[in-house]
Each structure stands twice: as structure tokens, then as C-alpha cells.
Curated annotation (Swiss-Prot):
Transmembrane segment boundaries: 31-51, 62-82, 89-109, 114-134, 143-163, 178-198, 208-228
Organism, scientific name: Human cytomegalovirus (strain Merlin) (HHV-5)
Membrane topology: Multi-pass membrane protein
Record key words, sorted: Host membrane, Membrane, Transmembrane, Transmembrane helix
Localization: Host membrane
Protein's name according to its UniProt entry: Membrane protein US20
GO cellular component: host cell membrane; membrane
Pfam families, alphabetized: Bax1-I
Xref: InterPro entries: Bax_inhibitor_1-related (IPR006214)
């Protein structure tokens, strides 16, 4: 009897030690991720405050929309290399600078309310799907239920968007962006599962980069969905809003 109790106590200690090791890995991964996200959002805020005269940069340069592919290309590289992908500070800062500059220019062209909304929605989606990854775990039945609920919510959103009074171009942009965000959220859930259950201590940087790339792809797609139709309408000669007029007049006076 005492031997069984000793074995049970030893097992519980081993489980506690194993859980603590996983917890330290999670702390490292999410600390690196928060640093990357804070750097990108901070740099974007500096661009937005420092270059108010360039609000129409994205309106005058349609080709810049292609830079939304930067995080997608980075994601393709990380998944293609897999465990052979380097996991060091050099790789971290290469991905960080490439995606931060892209996001900064997108933010420079956006309105303040769009930026705040995109920030909040990106963080909310990240927290929600990280929680779903913990909730779903490795149980396929749970993931089937989660997928069904998400599909119903997505179809409801698309139905409301298509029945709105917006023009056909805005409806197309919203639909494409909604499907793109859903795809990136699926990848985010997968990466979160990898961090929770399969992340070794020597791969913390690589997994943090994967989470960062997923979040930046979602953030840029949200900016494109919320600001894209306005940029296109401005390029077609639509009148500027009060905020743009104020910025333009201030720049002209200076």
C-alpha cells in the first residue's frame, strides 16, 4: 500500500515537472511573440504619426497591395523547411523587419478608427483561437464541433455583408478577405496546437515566428478589408473625408 502511494506521489511529481517544462516553453514562445507584435504595431504608429502627408500612398500605388503577400511567403518558407528551419535571433529579426515595414506602410495609409479596430480584432481573434486550441486539444470531436460553429458564424457574416447596401466591389473585397482570414485562423489554431503539445525548447523562436506571421497576415487582411474599398473609391475621384482634408490642408500650410 505504501509502495503504491509512493509510486503515485512520484508520478505526480514527474507530471508536475513535465508540466512546468512545458509552461516555461510557452512563456518563452509567447514572450517572443508579444515582442514582435508590439514592435510591429509600435513602428506602424510611428509611421502613422510621422507621415500624415502620405495618407494617399496606397491610393496612388496599387502595386503596393501585393506586399500583403509578404507574411504569406514567409509562412510558406517556414512550413516548407519545417524542423530544419533555423531558430535563432537573426532569423527572428529578418522576419520581423520584413513584416513590420509592410504593416507600417499599410497603417500609414489607414484612418485611426480602422487602425484601432484592426488592432482590437487581431488581438481578439488571436486570444480566441489560442483558447480554442487549449479547449480542443487533440480531441477530433471537439474540433468538429468548433469547426461547425465557426462555419455557421462565417456564413452568417457573409450573408449580412452580401445583403448590405454596399456596392459590389466592397462586397467582393469583404468576401475574399473573410475567406482569407478564415484560412489564416485555421493555420493559427494549428500553430497554437503545435506550441501547446509539440514545441521543443530549442524551437521556441521558430514557433513564435509562426504565430507572429499568422497574426500579421490576419492584421493586414483586416486593414485591406476595412480600408481597401475606400482607397479604391478615392482613386476613382471620390471626395476626401474631413480627416484627409485636414491633413492635406495642414501639410499645404506648412
Amino acid at each position: 500500500m505504501q509502495a503504491q502511494e509512493a509510486n503515485a506521489l512520484l508520478l505526480s511529481r514527474m507530471e508536475a515537472l513535465e508540466w512546468f517544462k512545458k509552461f516555461t516553453v510557452w512563456l518563452r514562445v509567447y514572450a517572443i511573440f508579444i515582442f514582435q507584435l508590439a514592435f510591429s504595431f509600435g513602428l506602424g504608429s510611428v509611421f502613422w504619426l510621422g507621415f500624415p502627408q502620405n495618407r494617399n500612398f496606397c491610393v496612388e500605388n496599387y502595386s503596393f497591395f501585393l506586399t500583403v503577400l509578404v507574411p504569406i511567403v514567409c509562412m510558406f518558407i517556414t512550413y516548407t523547411l519545417g524542423n530544419e528551419h533555423p531558430s535563432n535571433a537573426t532569423v527572428l529579426f529578418i522576419y520581423l523587419l520584413a513584416n513590420s515595414l509592410t504593416a507600417a506602410i499599410f497603417q500609414m495609409c489607414s484612418e485611426s478608427r480602422v487602425l484601432v479596430g484592426s488592432y482590437v480584432m487581431t488581438l481578439a481573434l488571436f486570444i480566441s483561437f489560442t483558447g480554442l486550441a487549449f479547449l480542443g486539444g487533440r480531441d477530433r470531436r471537439r474540433w468538429k464541433c468548433i469547426s461547425c460553429v465557426y462555419v455557421v458564424m462565417l456564413l452568417s457574416f457573409l450573408t449580412l455583408a452580401l445583403l448590405s447596401d454596399a456596392d459590389w466591389l466592397q462586397k467582393i473585397v469583404v468576401t475574399l478577405c473573410a475567406f482569407s482570414i478564415s484560412f489564416f485562423l485555421g493555420i493559427l489554431a494549428y500553430d497554437s496546437l503545435m506550441v501547446i503539445f509539440f514545441c521543443p525548447p530549442n524551437q521556441c523562436i521558430r514557433h513564435a515566428v509562426c504565430l507572429y506571421l499568422d497574426s500579421m497576415a490576419i492584421f493586414l487582411t483586416l486593414l485591406l478589408m476595412l480600408s481597401g474599398p475606400r482607397w479604391i473609391s478615392l482613386s476613382d475621384g471620390a471626395p476626401l473625408d474631413n480627416g484627409t482634408l485636414t491633413a492635406a490642408s495642414t501639410t499645404g500650410k506648412s
